[in-house]
Amino acid sequence: MAAAAPPPPPTAAPEPNMVAPLISPIGHPMFSRIRLATPSDVPFIHKLIHQMAVFERLTHLFSATESGLASTLFTSRPFQSFTVFLLEVSRSPFPATITSSPSPDFTPFFKTHNLDLPIDDPESYNFSPDMLNDVVVAGFVLFFPNYSSFLSKPGFYIEDIFVREPYRRKGFGSMLLTAVAKQAVKMGYGRVEWVVLDWNVNAIKFYEQMGAQILQEWRVCRLTGDALEAFDQVNI
């Protein structure tokens, strides 16, 4: 008769203030966090917006500068005006709290992903706010309040939502959109809306899978540049 196998060793308790990883016998664990951006994140936000302009084939419209973003993005409390959530990833668990920049306005979201293959990110050094802890910025969402007269409720308008190329199709975009939607529900808002380029069929399919309606009958109207400045000389 075969001898009984020895009992398995006890599972080590997670370290204090650390997010315990999911247990999986296979795969490559990746830890993610969504947090409020701060002024120190402006260089990463600027790079992300530029990469988004490249992806959307709209670099001819891109003129944002780091100084311009720094002077306009953080003038009000989060959710009262322009707000940015940053998506960060790491091969190590994140601390459960952000002691360097605590905020009473938002509690960060954490998630553990078990990937089939490791992620190859050749630009990680350009997007690392904390190189010592292997943290990399993988995406962002920029949004602000608007108002629906039909609902008589405020809502959120998403100006930008973007995930860097190495991190796409891994659930990170869903995390960013969910974070905004959850905040809208928490604040009693009536809707979240945004626009999508008509050629971006992958994004359209993704948004529909998330429950969004694509409003075919609406068109975006925009005054900007010289057309906007010309109104300075128009008498009312």
UniProtKB/Swiss-Prot annotation:
Entry keywords, A to Z: Acyltransferase, Cytoplasm, Nucleus, Transferase
Entries under Gene3D superfamilies matching the protein: 3.40.630.30
Domain N-acetyltransferase: 96-235
Record GO terms (molecular function): N-acetyltransferase activity; protein-lysine-acetyltransferase activity; protein-N-terminal amino-acid acetyltransferase activity
Active site: Y207 (proton donor)
Pfam family, one: Acetyltransf_1
Main localization (coarse): cytoplasm
Known EC number: 2.3.1.48
Residue sites binding acetyl-CoA per the record: I161, F162, V163, R169, K170, G171, F172, G173, S174, N200, V201, N202, Y207
CC per GO annotation: cytosol; nucleus
UniProt key word Transferase: yes
The reaction(s) this protein catalyses: an N-terminal L-alpha-aminoacyl-[protein] + acetyl-CoA = N-terminal N(alpha)-acetyl-L-alpha-aminoacyl-[protein] + CoA + H(+); L-lysyl-[protein] + acetyl-CoA = N(6)-acetyl-L-lysyl-[protein] + CoA + H(+)
Its biological purpose: Probable protein acetyltransferase with dual specificity triggering both N-alpha-acetylation (NTA) and epsilon-lysine acetylation (KA).
Assembly information from the UniProt record: Oligomer.
Listed name of the protein: GCN5-related N-acetyltransferase 8
Native source organism of the sequence: Arabidopsis thaliana (Mouse-ear cress)
Gene name in the database record: GNAT8
